[in-house]
Regions:
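N-terminal [4Fe-4S]-dependent radical SAM core
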Residues: 8-9, 173, 225-226
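A generic structural signal for residues embedded in beta-strands
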Residues: 2-4, 53, 199
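FNR/FR-type flavoprotein reductase catalytic core
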Residues: 37-186
Length: 226
């Protein structure tokens, strides 16, 4: 979570996935889309400015149990692509094959694809809602078509908006493929105290994204209560 110091507003930190890191250099990379006052403030910070960081928080994608030669899929919607450069590095190190499904509303939203040049060991499938780049339609439909054509994955990793997750849960459920969703929720404290990032659950009333997630299996989310 990122806090801009010496500002009256915004009051709360902004939560981001770590896109990449350089432990030796003490650096991390964040991919930020300007949406509201918090991200707008970060956008105009001069180079060399100081910000406060809190983290890393929550859990992470499961990679350690994947065997060499396994095949997985990554599904990213828009800025939901943010956590995947780091995940792809871990998959490559484990010799895991991976296809990337990257979706957005239009070609402009898919400009993030250049961040993945040389990182994806398998195929990169682009989808845009308006058909301006790649396959026309939702990225979840692109994955379903691959399943229908015989593609097989041992796991699907995903990050994006909740409507995409709801559709993707049906796709992976029909295919019988386990999945892990990096959920996007507005986080206030980062420790599970404020309950600002709760998601309806199936095994319990609510899941706290910052402490029980943000990586959740689709079976644990009550999609009919979103």
């Amino acid at each position: 979570m990122v806090e801009v110091p010496d500002r009256m507003r915004p009051y709360l930190r902004r939560a981001y996935s770590v896109a990449d890191s350089n432990p030796r250099g003490g650096e991390i990379e964040l991919l930020i889309k300007t949406i509201g006052p918090g991200t707008a403030t970060l956008e105009v910070l001069p180079e060399g400015s100081t910000v406060r960081l809190l983290g890393p928080l929550g859990n992470s994608f499961s990679v350690g149990d994947l065997g060499s030669g396994s095949r997985v899929a990554i599904v990213a919607g828009g800025i939901g692509a943010a956590p995947f450069p780091l995940l792809l590095a871990a998959l490559r190190a484990a010799s895991v094959n991976c296809d990337l499904y990257l979706g957005g509303r239009n070609a402009r939203e898919l400009s993030i694809r250049t961040r993945f040049d040389g990182l994806v060991p398998g195929e990169t499938i682009l989808s845009s809602d308006d058909g301006s780049l790649g396959e026309k339609g939702f990225v979840t439909e692109a994955l379903r078509r691959r399943f229908d054509a015989g593609s097989r994955y041992v796991r699907v990793f995903a990050c994006g908006p909740m409507p995409m997750f709801a559709a993707l849960a049906r796709v992976v459920g029909d295919a019988g493929v386990p999945a892990e969703f990096s959920t996007e929720a507005d986080m206030g404290c980062g420790f599970g105290a404020c309950l600002g990032c709760v998601i309806p659950g199936t095994e319990k009333a609510f899941l706290v994204s910052c402490s029980e997630g943000p990586i959740l299996s689709p079976e644990k989310i009550a999609w009919d209560r979103l």
